[in-house]
Amino acid sequence: MKNVLILGAGGQIARHVINQLADKQTIKQTLFARQPAKIHKPYPTNKMQTTSGKKVIQDR
């Protein structure tokens, strides 16, 4: 299984990429967005993980 990080996951281009990759059985996506509430749903959550910019900064 390949891991794919999508930066700017709340944007329009990312929405298209996420939808195309969601059909692939061999890809696990990590969606990164400054505001995770803007990530368009529904997406299958068993192959996706979301994280925000605030969390990354706080973990330092």
UniProtKB/Swiss-Prot annotation:
InterPro entries: NAD(P)-bd_dom_sf. SUPFAM superfamilies: NAD(P)-binding Rossmann-fold domains. Transmembrane segments: none annotated. Residues 40-60 are annotated as: Disordered. Missing about 170 C-terminal residues compared to orthologs. This is Protein YmjC. The gene is ymjC.
